[in-house]
Amino acid sequence: PVVSISGDGGFLFTATELATAVEYGINLVTIVFNDNRHGNVYRQQKEWFDGRFIASDLHNPNFVDFARSFGASAEYVETPDQLRSALERGLSTTGPTIIEARQVRDLPTPWQYIIEPPVRGPHAVDRQGGSAK
């Protein structure tokens, strides 16, 4: 089996591929952490654009009902123990399983260690290390 972990916004980009997973009986467990937000977009708008937010909040479907409408197994969890049990069930299920896990907003982010913030103005440098033009 394959385990996929994504946020709600990222999952929605390709959620209809669930139909293919059901059709071919692909053993896939997808954990969707749902905070009703494009978290990375929101974070960038907050940090890089002085909190000017646009199109970062989501109005999501019920992911359990959504998955079941394709014929996939699905369940909703609220605690780490429930997630562990749901993952074990999903790994032993034939075909795809969606696990929706509610997530609180504004959790600490690792992005400050992963990506550099944008630089604008006279100190901007292009990707090859030269001066901005």
Question: What are these model-derived regions, one by one?
Answer:
Residues 1-133:
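Thiamine diphosphate
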